[in-house]
Structure formats: C-alpha cells, structure tokens
C-alpha cells in the first residue's frame, strides 16, 4: 500500500472549509453551499501543495492565477482567502452577500487585497478569461523571458462546472485554447452531474472528454474528488507536466458532500436547513452548537503552507534584479507598462487631419491609427473574430500569435486570430486585460458585438481596459442587409454603466477615440466605425473630440441645433444650407461622438454645446433610445434596415438633406410658441 503525504490535519482543513461553507451561506440565508463542499478537497490540495502565491502581495507578477468560473461557488474562494491569510476576516464571511461587503454573491475584482483575478458570474465567462490569462502568460514569456530568466512561468488554474461547459462561450474559448496549445492552462471540471434543475442527464449527456480531446486538450481523470487527496495532487502534477496542450482535469465530486442532501440539486443553490447543518458538523467532528469554527491547528497548517508557496516571490525578486542588469531595455519597458504609463510623446503619433483631406471610412482611419501606435506601444495586442480584412485591425508589420509548432507565427506575435468566436474573443480579452503587460483590442462588426454582450458587460463590471473595434456600424454597410445592420445595438451599450461608446465622424475624432480608449484606465471602450467614406470636417480636432461633444458649426442666430454622431455629422452640416434655402432657417451643428465622455464635462460646457433658447434635434441612423437627455426631438431608425447600396438605403429611410431638413422644420414649428426653451442638458439629477 502506497503511503500518503496527507494526514489528519489535511482532512481537518478540508472539513473546516466544508463547515465554513455551510455556516457562511446559512448565516446569509442565501448562497450556494453544494459546490464549495464538493470542491473543498481540490481547493485544499491546489492552494496547499500546488500553486505559488503570496497573500501579503496578492498581485506579484509571476503568481499562479486562479479563476473560479462557476462563480456561484465563490464562498469557497472567500473561505480560502481567509484561511490562507489574505485580508478577509471571519466577520467578512459573516457579511457574505450583504451590501458593501468584501464578499459579494459572485466574485468581483474591486478588492485588490484578495486573489480574485477577474470577476465571474455568468457561467462560462471565467474559463474564457482563464484562456486570456493563459495567452497573456504565453505572450509575455515569449517577449520577456531570456535564458536563465523565466520572468513569466506561471500557470492558470480554473475551476468550472457543468453549467460553464454548457455555455457557448466556453466552447469558443476552449476550442481556441486547444489550437493555441496553451499548456499553462489547467481547467478543473467539477463533474458532479448536477445543475439547478436537477441531474445533468436531463439536458447534458455529451462526452465532455472527447469534446475536449477534439479541441486539442490533454485529459486527466480523478475518479474520487471527495477524499482521494493523493489522486487529486497526482492529477494536478500530471497536468503540469504536459507541455504542448491545455489540460482538462475530470474531477468527479459529490455536490454538497456531507449533507443529508448530497448529490442532489437541493443542495446547489440554497443554504442547508438547520438540522442538516447540525448533521454536517457532527459528521465532520465539529461542535454542532457553534458556527464559523476554525481550529487553531488549521490556521497554523495553512500558515506553514503559505510560507512555502510565497517563497517563490523572494526567489523571483533576486532573479529580476539580475535580469534588470542584463536586460535594462526590456525591464524598463516592462516596468513602464506595468505602471500603466505610456512612452513620452506617444500621443504625437496619433494622425491629425485638416479639412479638405481625402474622405476616408472611419474603419480605415482606425487602421491608420493602429499602424501609427502599435509600433510604439508594445502592450497593444490585437485581433479580430475572422474579419481582419473588413475590420482592418491588423497593422502593417504585425506578427500573428500562434504556437511555434504551427509555423503560422510565434507566441511573441501580437495579433490573435480569434476565428468566428465573437463572444469567446471578448471573454478572452477580459483575461488579457488583467494579466499585466497587455492592452487588448478586438474587431468584429458592430452588430456582432451583441454576440459578445455578456463578456462586454463583465469588462465594464471588472473595470477592464478593453477596446472593441466595431466596424460596419449602420445601414451604411449596405448590401449585407438587416441581419448585419445594427439598429438597437448602441442603445444597449450606451445604457451599460462604465463603458465609453465612441462613434467618430472623421479622422481627428477617430484619433481622439483611440486616445480616450487607451487612457481610460478602468473603462472599456467600443469604437463604432463606418464602412463608407466620410469627409474630414471643418472644426474637428482631437482636443475638441476628447470632450465627448463640441460645436462643429456655430451660428449665434440659429433656430435649431442639429446634433449628430459618426456619418450623420457631415449630413447635418450639409443640411444647414438646405434649411436656409428651403425654409429660411438657420442651424448650428454639434458632433457628439461619445455621450459618456460628454457627461464628464462641467454643465456649463455642456450648455455651451447644447444651449437654452432653441430646440435641439438628433440625427443618427440607429434607434433613438436615450437621446432625450440631449435633444428635444430625435430622428433615427424605428425599423430594421434593408439590403441595397448604402446611398439608396439612406434615401429610403430619409437620411438625406431634405429628410433631415423637413424634420428640423417640424421641430422648430413645434417649439416656436414656447417662450423659454430649456436645454435638455439641464436636469434635476
């Protein structure tokens, strides 16, 4: 019989995790005790024997990363944070799922003192982010590692459940991970065969192992994840020994292990009943009359294990000091990027345009920006969801990020071929954004950012600097028709907190959009870009556009303010002459490329742009939702588009000088008898 390195103290520690999961959810009268009870052995082995980390410095560079994709099991992560010595107390556990606590109902990134790399909640988002973290490591290692200096050698460990595997985003991300041969990625499948509805057999009976083998993953099996600690450790070690594939560990567990309801969906998403709490504590040798019990020897044991895990940081510091002497340029570059600073004068590389310059589509103007910035910002890592020739996201001289064995590129490459995987791309970029030395951007059609909305929302919630290059932004894309023409898309994202939604009207505004996106340290940005050519406008400057809105054409005697974005700004300018010749009306024109940035300006400035005294009317070939905060009347789209040449579509939907002028005339007439027209910018709150 083989002797085990695990003893009674390990069993006690695991059962402490389980009883804390019971008490934390019971105290909150809310939460998911089942998965934490089932995964307690795997978490114990991972953090006590496998991972390198340091609770005293949670963000040290070469730490192993842990992602809890089945985020409803977050009480497990909070308990481990407490036991391992992160800044999370028993009182914090007692505040689980309470307003303003360190322990919300799903993992969030707002507390840098914990080991939460990125938020997780909607199932599948965590594993997609884990793929991004793994790409981040592979790329950073290829760029910065040198013989004898493994600056980046960490693993990414991801716990995920049956629900994550059923979500489409996990398929997209894991398929790409297999293609990219991300051997530093280890996913642990909590194979307990239970979801909220009941047994997975009701809806999910595919062969997951064969599916992942088809993706190009290595498969490791652990038959008893409930008690076989040696088997669990062996599984991790075997996964770490694989050097050419990511690994899926098929860990068979019992949900709610120790509960009278173990192995059933009843223990998934509700606290245990009081009598069951007593049962669990008696079963594991704890006093059933007490709560939140942690034996002193368990604290002592984890302190000892943490000392071993954190020793890697001290060795790393010594290595980095030598690296800095040997490779000063690379170390200076890395330190600059990690400090979230840009090279001096980088903004001078932004293209600047003057009126009369050639009319160019803003997607092409975006490409010109990338051509200018990517050579001077090595932290920019781009890609596209198989629309590179349309999105124009690959800068001149770019090299692809590919496994070296593919002969298609190297891990040092900075352009990722995401394939037709919009949601996967966005989820992966969330991981890239938090790895460290990377600012990710990814391209697709604006309409298909809707496919990625779940991951975009997580970027906003996580305060991640991610850039979505969203081309073909309206009916102006033409013949592909309404399946590809966004109508309601931007209204959705404009309604989302903490995301900047840019729709530039010309070259200077496009440069401004990129400047804003890059310098918005904790906010993602969407850049909506045209397929059709747009003129370079008279009063457009980068400085003006960086205010989010500004006066493009002033007239102190104006009867109306026309407010446009993107391709409709030039239409508004052209309409001014039509209004004067046909209706004897004078108009001023405002460009409003980014509502969110405009909102950050003082009210006095916003009132100078959209003043009192005359009505304001918006012109935008999208749904009009949200415009009432800036204008009195909104001209937009109220149906889907159509298939045909872009000019014909603009005619059909009346986005012409005559169509805009007619509506402007009606707006002026509607407000002419109102003695004082108040700007919509003036709001009570």
Swiss-Prot record:
Keyword annotations of the record: Calcium, Magnesium, Metal-binding, Thiamine pyrophosphate, Transferase
Gene Ontology molecular function terms on file: metal ion binding; transketolase activity
Record-annotated site: Important for catalytic activity: 32, 268
Record InterPro entries: THDP-binding, Transketo_C/PFOR_II, Transketolase-like_C_2, Transketolase-like_Pyr-bd, Transketolase_bac-like, Transketolase_BS, Transketolase_CS, Transketolase_fam
Binding site for thiamine diphosphate: 72, 121-123, 163, 192, 268, 422, 448
CDD domains, sorted: TPP_PYR_DXS_TK_like, TPP_TK
Cofactor: Mg(2+); Ca(2+); Mn(2+); Co(2+)
Disulfide bonds: none
Subunit relationships: Homodimer.
Similarity-based family: Belongs to the transketolase family.
Name of this protein: Probable transketolase
Organism of provenance: Schizosaccharomyces pombe (strain 972 / ATCC 24843)
Lineage, highest ranks first: Eukaryota, Fungi, Dikarya, Ascomycota, Taphrinomycotina
């Amino acid at each position: 019989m083989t002797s085990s390195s695990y003893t009674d103290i390990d069993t006690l520690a695991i059962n402490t995790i389980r009883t804390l999961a019971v008490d934390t959810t019971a105290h909150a009268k809310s939460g998911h005790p089942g998965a934490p009870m089932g995964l307690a052995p795997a978490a114990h082995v991972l953090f006590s024997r496998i991972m390198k980390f340091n609770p005293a410095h949670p963000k040290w560079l070469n730490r192993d990363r842990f992602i809890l994709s089945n985020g409803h099991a977050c009480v497990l992560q909070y308990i481990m944070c407490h036991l391992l010595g992160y800044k999370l107390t028993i009182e914090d556990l007692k505040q689980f799922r309470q307003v303003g606590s360190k322990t919300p109902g799903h993992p969030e990134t707002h507390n840098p003192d914990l080991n939460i790399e990125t938020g997780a909640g909607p199932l599948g988002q965590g594993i997609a982010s884990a793929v991004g973290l793994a790409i981040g490591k592979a790329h950073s290692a290829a760029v910065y590692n040198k013989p004898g200096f493994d600056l980046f050698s960490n693993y990414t460990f991801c716990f995920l459940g049956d629900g994550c595997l059923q979500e489409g985003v996990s398929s997209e991300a894991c398929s790409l991970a297999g293609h990219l041969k991300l051997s530093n990625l280890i996913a642990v499948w909590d194979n307990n065969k239970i979801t909220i509805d009941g047994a997975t057999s009701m809806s999910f009976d595919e062969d997951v192992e064969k599916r992942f083998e088809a993706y190009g993953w290595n498969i490791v099996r652990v038959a008893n994840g409930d008690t076989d600690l040696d088997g669990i450790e062996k599984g991790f070690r075997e996964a770490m020994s694989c050097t050419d594939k990511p690994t899926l560990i098929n860990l068979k567990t019992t949900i709610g292990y120790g509960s009278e309801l173990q192995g059933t969906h009843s223990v998934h998403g509700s606290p245990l009943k009081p009598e069951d709490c007593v049962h669990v504590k008696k079963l594991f040798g704890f006093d059933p009359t007490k709560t939140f019990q942690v034996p002193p020897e368990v604290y002592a044991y984890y302190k000892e294990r943490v000392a071993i895990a954190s020793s890697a940081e001290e060795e790393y510091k010594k290595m980095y000091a030598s690296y800095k002497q040997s490779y000063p340029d690379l170390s200076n570059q890395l330190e600059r990027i990690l400090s979230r600073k840009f090279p001096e004068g980088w903004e001078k590389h932004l293209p600047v345009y003057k009126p009369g310059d050639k009319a160019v589509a803003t997607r092409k103007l975006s490409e010109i920006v990338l051509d200018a910035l990517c050579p001077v910002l090595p932290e920019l890592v781009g890609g596209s969801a198989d629309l590179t020739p349309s999105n124009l996201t690959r800068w001149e001289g770019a090299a692809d990020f590919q496994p070296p064995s593919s002969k298609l590129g190297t891990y040092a490459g900075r352009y990722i071929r995401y394939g037709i995987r919009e949601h996967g791309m966005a989820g992966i970029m969330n991981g890239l954004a938090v790895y460290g030395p990377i600012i990710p951007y990814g391209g697709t059609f604006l309409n298909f950012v809707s496919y990625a909305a779940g991951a975009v929302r997580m970027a906003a919630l996580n305060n991640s600097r991610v850039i979505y290059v969203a081309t073909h932004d309206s009916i102006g894309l033409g013949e592909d028709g309404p399946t590809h023409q966004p109508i309601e898309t931007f209204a959705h994202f404009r309604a989302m907190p903490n995301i900047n939604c840019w729709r530039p009207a010309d070259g200077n505004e496009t440069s401004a959009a990129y400047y804003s996106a890059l310098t918005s340290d904790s906010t993602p940005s969407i850049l909506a870009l045209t397929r059709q050519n747009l003129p370079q406008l008279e009063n457009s400057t980068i400085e003006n556009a960086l205010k989010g809105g500004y006066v493009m054409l002033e007239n102190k005697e104006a009867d109306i303010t026309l407010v446009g974005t993107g391709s409709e700004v030039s239409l508004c300018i052209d309409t001014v002459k039509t209004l004067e010749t046909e209706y004897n009306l004078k108009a001023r024109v405002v460009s409003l490329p980014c509502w969110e940035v405009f909102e950050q300006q003082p009210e006095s400035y916003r009132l100078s742009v959209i003043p009192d005294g005359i009505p304001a009317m918006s012109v935008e070939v999208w749904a009009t939702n949200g415009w009432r905060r800036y204008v009195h009347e909104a001209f937009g789209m109220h149906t889907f588009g159509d298939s045909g040449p872009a000019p014909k579509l603009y005619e059909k939907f009346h986005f012409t000088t005559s169509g805009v002028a007619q509506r402007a005339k009606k707006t002026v007439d509607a407000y002419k008898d109102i003695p004082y027209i108040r700007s919509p910018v003036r709001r009570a709150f």
